[in-house]
Structures are given as structure tokens and as C-alpha cells.
Regions:
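FAD-binding core of flavoproteins
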Residues: 68-74, 81, 87-196, 325-333
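Alpha-helical interface subdomain recognition
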Residues: 1-67, 181-333
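Short beta->alpha linker loops
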Residues: 74-77, 217
Length: 333
């Protein structure tokens, strides 16, 4: 068995086991993930990491989405990669990333706030980019933490700091784009899981003397759902491959992937709930954590409008004659 197969098998087993613990606290979920070394997936082996590729990251994060894993494995993977690239030390506990930052950095100290931070209240370190600098805030230094959750009950906290000491290094990374990669992979997995559940339910639920999956109209809707799920997976694979090849210059592929994933969510979740009916909306039912996450992730790290504008500007900038050659030259990175 290859290293990639071993990685995927380990992630599938661990995430599946953790997903079954619906009432488990954060520490009970995060502890096994951290102990298994998943946060260090993109850190080179020479620096104590797994030495995985961006495609490995896609596979792991897709499985996190498939199992609706309630902890920030993607954010931790990106945080560890950023810290390693910047030559900064890895923290002992959870390191996460801040989608939004508002404040001032002066002489190695930060005053302001970071918002929408995945599990920010649980984090040892919070990474953000401000004025071309990667800054690492210590969670314990927060003057105040305002706990918030997205519609899927995932922690999205706001932390306030006053004259807090930070570690920092020059950084050109776009945290919105990196976060969009995380969400695209998670969306791909959650779409696949919701599709599988919808097909299984359609083959079990009977109306008018036969399984509802035998009705042509429903079969057509599920076929469209399958197309959307496949499109998200293809776009996600391409974006992660481009990130591995082009680094920060992969914005076009990231924008296309996150936008494609966002669009697919509306189609896929509508079909899933049409198939399941009322039971699909109950919190106890396994479809519920998937679709609530999909609706939440659609607006995180860039909504439809944000990534549409990014794509539009790049198309216009390339010009009519150069756009197609540019696009095809970057295909299948």
C-alpha cells in the first residue's frame, strides 16, 4: 500500500470514528487529530512533518468534509505550513487562521481584533496577515473573546487584543485564498456524503408501492446532483494541484474552484432535502450536519460575488487574445 493510500485510510478511519461522537467536546475531537500528526501534513519531513503534497491535503480535507468533522484540521494544516515557511516555531496546541483582521501593528505589538476565527477560543496561536506581515497572536493574550458560531454550530470567534506581543515574518500569502482551498475540499467531501445518503434513502423509502428512487423525475435530480458533486471534486483537485505548482499565483484556479463549489451547494442541498423530506431537517439525522456545513461554508473565505469578481478581473486583464492561451497553458498542472 502506498503512503498516500495509508494516509487516506488512516484519515477515513479516524474521522469516521470521531464523527460518530456527536456530543463529544472539542478536546475529545481535536486530541486524536493532533496526535495523529495531521496538522503537520504539509510540513517537510526534515522539519518534523509528514512531507505531504497539496493533493494529499485535498484528500484529507475532503474526508474531513465527508464526515462533517467538527474541528479545524484544515486551518491547522495551513497554519503549520505558513509557520514552517516563515521559519517560525510551531506551537504546542492548536494553531488556526484568522479570516479577518482589523488593527495596527507597531514594533512587534498588535492592537485590534481578529474575527471569524475557527475555534479561536480554543487556539494557542492565531495567524493573520497584516501589512505584508504574517503575525502570530497568542490566544492567551486576548483581552476579550466574543464566542460566535456559524449556522452549523462551528466556532467562529472574535478575539480582541491590546498591545499584544506577536511573532512576525514577511508574508505574501493570501489567507482568503488558502481558506478557500480548505473549504473547497470540505465542500467536495460533504457533497459526496450528502449524495450517497440521498441515493441510499431514495432506494429505501417507498411511496405508491415502490422505492421513490424508481421515479424518473427523482432519478434526474439525483443525476444532476452527482454532476455537481463531480464538478466540485474536479475543480478542487485542479486548485490544489495548481497551489502545489504555482503557489500564490494559483489564484485563478482557487477562485474558479471555490466559486464552482459555492454554486453546486445550492443545487445539491436542495435535491438532498427534497429527497429526504422533513426527516432531513432534524438535527439527529445524519444529513443535517452536512447541509448546514455546506450552507455555512458557501459564504466563508469568499462568497459567490467575491470570487466572481476575482475571476472577472483576471479575464479582463488577460484580454481577448491572450485569455484562452493563458488558460490552456495552465490546465492540468
Amino acid at each position: 500500500m502506498s503512503d498516500e493510500s495509508l494516509l487516506i485510510d488512516a484519515a477515513a478511519r479516524l474521522f469516521g470514528d470521531l464523527a460518530a461522537k456527536r456530543d463529544a467536546g472539542f478536546a475529545d475531537l481535536w486530541g486524536p487529530v493532533a496526535e495523529a500528526g495531521f496538522p503537520l501534513l504539509l510540513v517537510p519531513e526534515a522539519d518534523g512533518g509528514f512531507g505531504g503534497s497539496w493533493q494529499d491535503a485535498f484528500a484529507v480535507l475532503r474526508l474531513a468534509g465527508y464526515h462533517a468533522l467538527a474541528c479545524p484540521v484544515g486551518e491547522a494544516i495551513i497554519a503549520a505550513w505558513l509557520l514552517n515557511a516563515a521559519g517560525l516555531a510551531q506551537p504546542e496546541g492548536l494553531a488556526t487562521i484568522a479570516p479577518r483582521i482589523d488593527g495596527k501593528l507597531s514594533d512587534g505589538r498588535f492592537t485590534g481584533s481578529v474575527a471569524g476565527v475557527p475555534w479561536g477560543g480554543e487556539a494557542t496561536a492565531i495567524l493573520a496577515v497584516l501589512d505584508g506581515q504574517l503575525i502570530v497572536l497568542t490566544g492567551a493574550d486576548a483581552e476579550r473573546i466574543d464566542p460566535h458560531e456559524n449556522p452549523a454550530d462551528e466556532s467562529r470567534d472574535t478575539l480582541h487584543f491590546t498591545d499584544a506581543a506577536v511573532a512576525q515574518a514577511a508574508c505574501s500569502a493570501d489567507l482568503t485564498a488558502l481558506g478557500a482551498l480548505i473549504r473547497t475540499a470540505q465542500i467536495a467531501g460533504a457533497m459526496d456524503a450528502a449524495l450517497a445518503q440521498s441515493i441510499a434513502y431514495a432506494n429505501e423509502r417507498e411511496q405508491f408501492g415502490k422505492p421513490i428512487g424508481k421515479f424518473q423525475a427523482l432519478q434526474q435530480n439525483l443525476a444532476v446532483f452527482a454532476e455537481e458533486a463531480a464538478a466540485v471534486n474536479c475543480a478542487g483537485h485542479a486548485a490544489f494541484a495548481a497551489a502545489g505548482k504555482y503557489g500564490g499565483a494559483a489564484e485563478f484556479e482557487v477562485a474558479a474552484a471555490k466559486l464552482r463549489a459555492n454554486i453546486a451547494i445550492g443545487i445539491g442541498t436542495s435535491t438532498a432535502h427534497q429527497v429526504h423530506g422533513a426527516i432531513g431537517f432534524t438535527r439527529e439525522y445524519s444529513l443535517n450536519p452536512l447541509t448546514r456545513r455546506l450552507w455555512s461554508w458557501r459564504s466563508e473565505f469568499g462568497n459567490d460575488r467575491y470570487w466572481s469578481q476575482i475571476l472577472g478581473r483576471q479575464v479582463v486583464a488577460a484580454g481577448a487574445d491572450a485569455f484562452w492561451p493563458t488558460l490552456t497553458s495552465r490546465s492540468d498542472p
